[in-house]
Amino acid sequence: FSSFFPGIAGLKGIPMWAFYVNRGQGICSFGIKNKNYSIMEFYPANVSYSVVNTFGFRTFLKIKKSNKTICYEPFLNNSADTENIKQTMKILPYELILEEINKNIGIKITVKYFTLPNQPVAGLMRSVTVENITNSDISVEVADGIPKILPYYMNTYAQKFMSTTIQAWATVDNFEKTGVPF
């Protein structure tokens, strides 16, 4: 299934839309106003089902336990071990929660999405929690994010039919001064 997450922003906030599917880490596109103001490229549901694991949010874990290193990407849905790996998705009016419990590795991963209410900017907030569910010590390194953020007002036409030209014109402002692109 697929749907739009409510863009709840409060009385003084700016609403943000987010499109999710029941695969991967859920969110496959989000932005403000409409799809011409996407932050993450909009795809219809039939395409989103197959690209969310590549173009959506991803989490990579490097887990060290008992002198053994395991590299793992949760929420991939490529395991036939449904007895030891459980995934759930909770959809609330103000929050989307994904949870994976992997008994083989001994971890529980929780991802929460929610909008930023009553603020002068729109925001899709994301929280990732990794919990050790064993009695053994583990060390975890995490890399998390999305593979591509669209420049402001890169409309749907430009995304679909002029992407190479638009990429050549995209710039990053203020990086030299602050070290933070915006």
Indicate where each model-derived feature is located:
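Anionic coordination/interaction segments
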Residues: F1-F182
